[in-house]
Amino acid sequence: MGIESLCSADASEPFWDWNLTWHTENPDFTQCFQNTVLVWVPCIYLWVCFPAYFLYLRSHDRGYIQMSILNKAKTALGLILWIVCWADLFYSFWERSQNIFRAPFFLISPTVLGITMLLATFLIQHERLKGVQSSGVMMIFWLISLLCATVIFRSKIMLALNTDTEVDAFRYVTFCTYFILLLVQLILSCFPEKPPLFSEAVNDPKPCPEFSASFLSRITFWWITGLMIQGHRRPLEAKDLWSLNKEDTSEEIVPGLAKNWAKEWAKTKRQPLNMLYSSKKQQKSSDSNGEVMEEAEALIIKPSQRSSEASLSKVLYKTFGPYFLMSFLFKAAHDLLMFTGPEILKLLINFVNNKSAPNWQGYFYTGLLFVCACLQTLILHQYFHICFVTGMRLKTAIVGVIYRKALVITNSARKTSTVGEIVNLMSVDAQRFMDLATYINMIWSAPLQVILALYLLWRNLGPSVLAGVAVMILLVPINAVMAMKTKTYQVAQMKSKDNRIKLMNEILNGIKVLKLYAWELAFREKVLEIRQKELKVLKKSAYLAAMGTFTWVCAPFLVALSTFAVYVKVNKNNILDAQKAFVSLALFNILRFPLNILPMVISSIVEASVSLKRLRVFLSHEELDPDSIIRGPITNAEGSIVVKNATFSWSKTDPPSLNSINFTVPEGSLIAVVGQVGCGKSSLLSALLGEMDKKEGYVVVKGSIAYVPQQAWIQNATLEDNIIFGREMNESRYKRVIEACALLPDLEILPMGDRTEIGEKGVNLSGGQKQRVSLARAVYCNADTYLFDDPLSAVDAHVGKHIFEKVIGPKGILKNKTRVLVTHAVNYLPQMDTILVMTDGEISEMGSYQELLKQDGAFAEFLRTYANAEQSMESSDASSPSGKEGKPVENGVLVNDATGKLMHRQLSNSSTYSRETGKSQHQSSTAELQKPLAEKNSWKLTEADTAKTGRVKATVYWEYMKAIGLYISFLSVFLFMCNHIASLASNYWLSLWTDDPVVNGTQQYTNVRLGVYGALGISQGIAVFGYSMAVSIGGIFASRHLHLDLLHNVLRSPMSFFERTPSGNLVSRFSKEIDTIDSTIPPIIKMFMGSTFNVIGACIIILLATPIAAVVIPPLGLVYLLVQRFYVATSRQLKRLESVSRSPVYSHFNETLLGVSVIRAFEEQKRFIKQNDMKVDENQKAYYPSIVANRWLAVRLEFVGNCIVLFAALFAVIARNKLSPGLIGLSVSYSLQITAYLNWLVRMTSDLETNIVAVERVKEYAEMEKEAEWSIEETAPASTWPQEGKVEFRGFGLRYREDLDLVLKNINITINGGEKVGIVGRTGAGKSSLTLGLFRINEAAEGEIIIDGINIAKIGLHDLRFKITIIPQDPILFSGSLRMNLDPFDQHSDEDIWRSLELAHLKNFVSSLPDKLNHECSEGGENLSVGQRQLVCLARALLRKSKILVLDEATAAVDLETDNLIQSTIKSQFEECTVLTIAHRLNTIMDYTRVLVLDRGEVVECDSPDNLLQAKGLFYSMAKDSGLA
């Protein structure tokens, strides 16, 4: 009974009839089935989808779409369909009234269908109101409805044609109308609606076409075709890329992860905080950082006392879980569809064996196989698309959170996480999560596939499968051990990588010092030592990987062998026929994928777990307590800065650096902080900024703060951007600031005035200019409180005096502001309201200048000792407004070739910054300020990372092969071939075995068949192990070779290269590109080779079985190649654009880490976070189209593969009477795999081409111009050279590039051995150029320099630079021991080093350190004061004992006492030596033998100081300006 009662009033009509539907040459469904199931299926689909879809639309409102003709048409058709359905219903009621009783379905089906059509019409309108431009749910509904209606339509036509029965005319007409309306609805649903009103896409100049694309376009990724065509016609550029979808932007993604992490972090510290001011913390946390953007709030506000570990994995799951759920559903559907192939193959082989089966069944199976394969393709690539987008979002979120965290971690945390480590977190670790997102579902999917495959195998072969299962179980512990080991190696490798990147960062930051000292080789060895450890671990990983590949490639074969062996041996009557063998083989092939992918997934999870831990450790670092310093408006009148009983240390565990600090600064007063080197002056400012850990006490700083650090921090932006620093432009204030900070003459030097882009870290500015830009930034921001950390040290005293008068002093711009000035310049002290004297981290004295003199304490003694020095501060090189004024013109010249000639304008004498000439400069520089922005881009002094275009050249592959070694390369290919030949032979042998005749219920020769099958398998395994080892070892050879080349080429590059190239580009080469060469390219090569041979093998088998396939395979192959070439052009360029847009992310991040204290002081975190987000989004703008392009290609190529499946099955059906079941089984089972092979081959081809770009980018630097040879044996001078120290300049001229004017010309001067020569000159005179020429940092354009009779151009650079010593302006130290910083080549004994430290006045300090000479200097030497670093540089010079010493403003950053010590040391220890000093303070060279006066690149005067003063020339005017004449 049951459903039969619906079919007719008396239940006489059947619901299903096998004879009508299956066992016939002309199949059809029963009337009842047609009018129930085929009508209800689409209705059930829509009603099942409705609740979830309705809720989805409610939560995803994109704004409503206006009624369009398309929407009106769809709505009208929906209503007509409802009318047609209910016309049928009313007709049935009318029939009943006429006593014609039809089956119940004539009433039920039109009712259900009518209501469903009303629901569909409602959804059409609801989708419009919610902004859905193209609906997948509705399109699938119309498609299912049409397919079901097509079956009924065919049946009705056949009924009308084949029988004499009377046709129900009314129902015939209504059904035809219904069918046509469905067809029109389906066609209309293929077209998208207009964008919703007020949608962002309307205002976006380059919106991503994805959301406006139709459903059909989205599932086939047709919407990216426009970009693919564009990329095929010409190389893509950044401007061709679309904007990022809103839900993929940092603005949308990062806040979610940041908030969830903050909540998780808060949970781990439930216990009350044992802090002095915990109650105040709670009340302040809401408003103390009101400025900080919302998503950063959680990270910036929370203090960081941890009680237990927060779980980052839980947070990531909470944030990205919903995306993974979507991918879970798609993956589950795909996995189930995957097993339809073997099941249909089983039916197909049965069909071939059953000669009486009707032909249509074969075609039906073929069609079904094709449809299932196409569905599988569409679902698989939607799954992949979701995974990749999730991975992209995951990376965006992680990078965003790391950046936000980096802005708030404490200084002690910064020491544990160096710049290199944090950059690695952003590049390598974030990438690991991105990769994991693709594979994460395999954790459950692989076991599911294995279980389903084993179940179907059990059905096919029975208990014999248990033998295969046993083999698999045996392999599990082997792989578990390998996974554990891999994790250990992974941790070790990452540690080495961090150390290497950290060291490279330092090398790149201090490259000028390395070149001047000729230390490149020592540091190259240090890098290679770390690299050697890294490669050692990589080699161990490679052996493991080879073992892993061996076990996993052999696993399916071993499973098959053991299963078949047990099956045929257990019972002689078990026949291995084609159906059993090839269905099992198809299942084993399915089994191969999860078994092959599992190790990849495990290693990906292992890598991600290592990264997860590193990331969690970083995100759990202590953060600065925003409430340790009370900021903001203060009602009481105590003062602008109030510090009571405050004790500070650099970290919670360190002893206090500042003890019992008590002072109050009245509003608007000027305070000086003085003291010896390393007494805690800079620490005091850091404490007021909240950069130190407050142990106890109370600190209030009123209003906003502006901070000028001792070492100026300059951004890679225009001069104007550096000064405005994110604030609004106020022309009049800006001009006032420029003038007050003595920057007007510099604007004349710079080609585009303040619009000139200055290089990274301001490399193209002198120390003095950098300091003045840093000062101008602070002055412009108009803060309430100003903290100056010795800003006058890097500028000449004359300029310092101007700045003090115009800016800092009682009559300066800031006269009404509160100012705290750390200074070594005692001549300004009488003008101070209060002076704080620091001694060993405490305030030893405090009061006005007069009060302190009266106290007759340490301060008075200090002043008496240095009374002369005070006077000498007035006497200085007044010739220039900055400390190192040769440099602006000289390095400013590093500009684009076309416009370079225009730039080189030397300054006239009027450039001297003085009251008399101020007016004329102001006018000329105002014009500079107003130069049009249109020219801005032509004056960038640094070069952005550029993307190459076109195909990756074959030479790049050849270079990589050579790096591997040609022998290993060819051996690998040979072993790959052996492996695949053995694989094909074993399967062909199996097909012959299955075709063996059955005699008396058994097959003969079973033992032989089994033995040969096993032998082929073993030879396959040996070849697999061989090629795995060869590729892995070859990859390591290539890694070593390419890294060595890159390192050598970068170190050999001239200084101009580093001034043009942002360090982010170089760091990217050493981190991301080398990581790609280390870890990504070798496995890709392995998979590429494997896929290539798999495709070739499958085609050979199909052609052997059905030679007619030769008609189809070549054209399909041609389509395949065309589509692939079409794709690769775009994909390759997108990868390059992604690489290029990645560098600015690192550069900006590096820049932020270096200037984090300035950013925090100015409270600019919000703006910098936004900038970082924009740079990350720019990077993802190139990455997103590349992942879509991958899917676009895969869908098209899998369709080609599905066509091969279709034709292989079709030809097998056509030729079923001629072919053996074994061959058909072999052919179809291989064709089933070809789709996956093709897909994998293209992915690997594309991956190989896109990743080989890393080799291309590394090799790029091999072609750069190089410096001269480091050493030339033939011309190497004697080890005792130079004995005399005589330096002759003969007609010497110098230019910075071939197309530029000379900056030094016709220099003819002889400096005798032992002479002390001062070099002075006005701005741009060429003082620094002379030293750069002497060290051959820039080569001579004309003339020559002779030292002790040897032309320095003829000898090696190291031979020269080792023999001359310089004490540079910027004292740079490297992380490592103090001993390494003094003697990196380990050439000197401890006695020598201690003696040099004693002479440099550092012996007491170093002796007091726990580790003495092994004291670890932090990155950049940050754990020593600038003065102490300068003394270390002096100790280096003393240690080298060279005959020629060059001083480049070496005493700019030290106090007067230290300056005096340095000068006396130089006089005593270098008495016999030739000393060249670029004079910073004229008084220091007044006792020199001679003074060399340069002007406009020429020597204008050269004589003893006394004679020059009497001559009343240029030197006299400079001395007069300084008060020395």
From Swiss-Prot:
Location of this chain's protein in the cell: Cell membrane
One Pfam family per UniProt: ABC_membrane
Descriptive protein name: Multidrug resistance-associated protein 1
E.C. number(s) listed in UniProt: 7.6.2.2, 7.6.2.3
Functional note: Mediates export of organic anions and drugs from the cytoplasm. Mediates ATP-dependent transport of glutathione and glutathione conjugates, leukotriene C4, estradiol-17-beta-o-glucuronide and other xenobiotics. Hydrolyzes ATP with low efficiency. Mediates ATP-dependent, GSH-independent cyclic GMP-AMP (cGAMP) export. Thus, by limiting intracellular cGAMP concentrations negatively regulates the cGAS-STING pathway.
GO cellular component: basolateral plasma membrane
Family (UniProt): Belongs to the ABC transporter superfamily. ABCC family. Conjugate transporter (TC 3.A.1.208) subfamily.
Extracellular face residues: 1-33, 96-100, 155-172, 337-362, 461-463, 568-589, 983-1019, 1105, 1219-1220
Substrates-to-products reaction catalysed: ATP + H2O + xenobioticSide 1 = ADP + phosphate + xenobioticSide 2; an S-substituted glutathione(in) + ATP + H2O = an S-substituted glutathione(out) + ADP + phosphate + H(+); sphing-4-enine 1-phosphate(in) + ATP + H2O = sphing-4-enine 1-phosphate(out) + ADP + phosphate + H(+); leukotriene C4(in) + ATP + H2O = leukotriene C4(out) + ADP + phosphate + H(+)
Boundaries of every ABC transmembrane type-1 domain copy: 324-607, 969-1250
Enzyme class: translocase
Xref: InterPro entries: AAA+_ATPase (IPR003593), ABC1_TM_dom (IPR011527), ABC1_TM_sf (IPR036640), ABC_transporter-like_ATP-bd (IPR003439), ABC_transporter-like_CS (IPR017871), ABC_transporter_C-like (IPR050173), MRP (IPR005292), P-loop_NTPase (IPR027417)
Segments on the Cytoplasmic face: 55-74, 122-133, 194-315, 384-439, 485-546, 611-961, 1041-1083, 1127-1197, 1242-1525
SUPFAM superfamilies per UniProt: ABC transporter transmembrane region, P-loop containing nucleoside triphosphate hydrolases
Manganese as UniProt keyword: no
NCBIfam families xref list: MRP_assoc_pro
Keyword terms, alphabetized: ATP-binding, Cell membrane, Hydrolase, Lipid transport, Membrane, Nucleotide-binding, Repeat, Translocase, Transmembrane, Transmembrane helix, Transport
